[in-house]
Design a protein with these regions (language model features):
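Extended beta-strand/beta-hairpin segments
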Residues: 1-56, 67-147
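Alpha-helical metal-binding/catalytic segments enriched in His/Glu/Asp
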Residues: 61-62
Length: 147
């Protein structure tokens, strides 16, 4: 299905649970328990943090963009996995903490004879990821595409 609209609107609702924890919901999707990461006050290891959600959003958006470009070019993706690591640091210009660099290591396995064509689509996949376009962080994708 082709994208027709030039504006897409999404919503989420957060409900505070006390302390530093909350639950995020959106429609009929499963609720997502959130808290700070363990290295911050009130952080919990068993809940998603905004930092981890951001990295997951980058990974999944890049994957979906890559899959769409592969499908459009009749390429068969047989396996796909990614691992993102991001650095948050205080920026010199405004002294605010922010993600400054994110590295995403992507492993994809294509049908025989399709790896080279898939490699040609990585720039488009990166360009068309809405989440990447929405951040000022330096996003470095390291693609490992095999057959």
């Amino acid at each position: 299905m082709a994208l027709r609209s030039k504006v897409f609107t999404y919503g989420a609702e957060l409900t505070w649970q006390g302390g530093h924890t909350a639950v995020v919901a959106s429609g009929d999707r499963p609720p997502l328990p959130v808290a700070p990461p363990p290295d911050f006050p009130g952080g919990e290891d068993d809940r998603w943090s905004p930092e981890h959600i951001f990295l997951a959003a980058l990974e999944s958006c890049t994957m979906l963009s890559f899959l769409a470009h592969c499908a459009h070019n009749d390429l068969e993706v047989r396996e796909y996995s990614a691992r993102a690591t991001g650095s948050i640091e205080r920026r010199d210009d405004d002294q605010r903490y922010a993600f400054t660099h994110v590295q995403v290591l992507v492993h994809a396995r294509m049908a025989p004879g399709q790896a080279a064509a898939a490699r040609e689509l990585t720039d488009k996949a990166e360009r068309d990821c809405f989440i990447t376009a929405s951040t000022n962080a330096d996003i470095e994708n390291d693609w490992r595409i095999l057959e």
